[in-house]
């Protein structure tokens, strides 16, 4: 009898493993009136999404420059890593949404002239669409944002601009925007900024320099978001991330800051992703 039970369990293992697998869809789209085009996105649905009626927390996971909504799927291996974290209990079951910010114009922000309004699209159209389409808990405590490089910059600015919407933010190897006004010179050479006025440039700096935004954060916002900043010791963006950490320390903004061995590549970010999922899950739980 014991041998029969053992054999049955062995035969059932592939079925059990299959049942514990989430799903990824990486070529979905929604129509944007703000951007006047269809915008693609990818989504990870946890293993029990199709067999339950429950709603889930959500992570908005932002890609870097040169990638699109498929980056975290193809290179970041979100399906394998999220499934493993959920199965092992280091992360709670969640939905992961990965928007495209590489089509039309690259980036997560409104451009300086205001004729490309990605940030407005994200908050006014994309988030409401996603959270109405999927079974997502629509409260701040169940919503987080993370991203790498350009997406790390988006993570910083989105959570700084909307601390009422995100419980946690986890920028990886983040592009921290112009670090000072002199640094703005390299930004003005970008498309759409060549003819910007001095006032437009100064306004852009104040709204997109992460160290400057941290420096000017109101006291009542300093504990609204749980922060975790992660950057490799061989990453060319180490300076900006270190300066942000220093400003946060000076201004009494609670956060975690890690410099680990590694560079600006997918090997580093795949290693970071389980930590991201665990950290944001702490906020999703009651604590």
List the predicted regions and their residue ranges.
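Non-catalytic cap/lid and distal C-terminal segments of serine-dependent acyl enzymes
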Residues: 20-287
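Sec-dependent N-terminal signal peptides
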Residues: 4-16
């Amino acid at each position: 009898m014991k041998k029969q039970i053992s054999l049955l369990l062995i035969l059932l293992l592939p079925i059990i493993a299959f049942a514990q697998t989430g799903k990824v869809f990486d070529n979905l789209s929604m129509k944007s009136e703000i951007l006047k085009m269809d915008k693609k996105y990818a989504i990870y649905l946890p293993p029990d999404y199709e067999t339950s009626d429950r709603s889930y927390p959500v992570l908005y996971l932002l890609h870097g420059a040169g990638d699109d909504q498929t980056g975290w799927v193809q290179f970041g291996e979100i399906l394998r890593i999220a499934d493993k974290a959920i199965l092992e209990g280091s992360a709670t079951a969640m939905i992961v949404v990965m928007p495209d910010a590489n089509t039309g114009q690259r980036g997560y922000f409104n451009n300086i002239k205001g004729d490309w309004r990605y940030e407005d699209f994200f908050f006014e159209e994309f988030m409401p669409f996603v959270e109405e389409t999927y079974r997502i808990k629509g409260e701040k405590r169940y919503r987080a944002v993370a991203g790498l490089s350009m997406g790390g910059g988006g993570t910083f600015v989105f959570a700084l601009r909307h601390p009422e919407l995100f419980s946690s933010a986890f920028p990886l190897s983040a592009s921290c925007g112009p670090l000072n006004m002199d640094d703005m010179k390299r930004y003005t050479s970008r498309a759409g900024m060549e003819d910007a006025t001095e006032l437009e440039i100064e306004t852009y700096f104040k709204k997109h320099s992460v160290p400057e935004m941290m420096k000017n954060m109101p006291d009542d916002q300093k504990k609204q978001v749980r922060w975790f900043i992660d950057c490799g010791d061989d990453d060319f963006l180490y300076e900006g991330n270190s300066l942000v950490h220093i400003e946060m320390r000076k201004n009494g903004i609670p956060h975690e800051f890690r410099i680990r061995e590694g560079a600006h590549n997918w090997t580093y970010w795949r290693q970071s992703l389980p930590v991201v999922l665990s950290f944001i899950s702490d906020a999703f739980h009651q604590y």
